[in-house]
Each structure stands twice: as C-alpha cells, then as structure tokens.
Amino acid sequence: MGSIVVMQNSILADTDVLVDFLRGHEKAVAFISEFSSRIILSAIVVAELYAGVKGNAEPAVLENFIFLFRVVPLTTEMAKIGGLYKRDFGKSHGVGLADAILAATADAEKAELKILNVKHYPMLSGMEPAYKK
C-alpha cells in the first residue's frame, strides 16, 4: 500500500519574527525551528532585513540565514494587489506598503502569513500572531 502525503501550506514569515529569531528570542527560535522546512521569505522581507543590518559582519550572517529559505520574488500581480491593499487600508488602519505587499505575497503563494502585529493586516481575516511576546 502507498502512503498518503499531506502537503502543508508554506509559511511566509514577517520581518519581526525573523529579527526576533536572529536576536535569539526563545519563542521565535522555537517557532522557526518547528516550521523551518515550510518557511518562505518575501523579497520585501529580505530588503527589510538588510535595511536593519549593522556593522561589517552582520551582512554575511544574514546572507547565510536567508540562504536557508526560498525567497519569493515580487511579481507585478503581487505589487498590484499590495498597492490596492495599501490604498484600501493605508489611511484607515495604518497599513504600510511593505505589509500590504507581504499580504499580497501570502495570497499569491497560498501561504500562511506569520506575523507579530495583527493590526497591520486587516485585509486578511483570522490573523493570529506567530507567538506571544
């Protein structure tokens, strides 16, 4: 008899979750460790991570970390949907463009978006933080 393989959705991790992991926060380390085989990164998240790099050694550490995951490039469709999310939720909910594009990327990839600040994602229903701080 053959075995049944259950495919699980990818997990698109937000920058805050990854920064917590890189800083050694226990809950983030546990989260990334548990789901590492399913985690994907958005090109936007990669840009945000590099924007926060300090010193000369950190870029190499960050590059090695990013290499562990599949990075989803930004497509025109993701940019369009992200722009519409920003238009629709930017003023009313304080949604920034990066968060809007991240939500659009999760939609396009059919991925679970794992974040810390659910207020940034009113366009996605049922959002829960990846872990409680």
PLM features: residue spans?
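Short, well-structured N-terminal submotif of metal-dependent ribonuclease cores
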Residues: M1-L41, A51-F67
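Acidic, PIN/NYN-like endoribonuclease modules and their adjacent C-terminal/linker elements
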Residues: M1-N9, A103-K133
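Generic structural signal for small/hydrophobic residues in well-ordered secondary structure
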Residues: D14-T15, L49, G82, A106
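Alpha-helix capping/helix-boundary segments
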Residues: V17-L18, V45, M78, I101-L102, ...
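Nucleotide phosphate-binding site architecture
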Residues: L18-V19, A47-Y50, P122, A130
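Acidic catalytic patch
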Residues: F69-K91
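Acidic donor-binding loop at a coil-to-helix junction in glycosyltransferase catalytic cores
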Residues: L97-A98
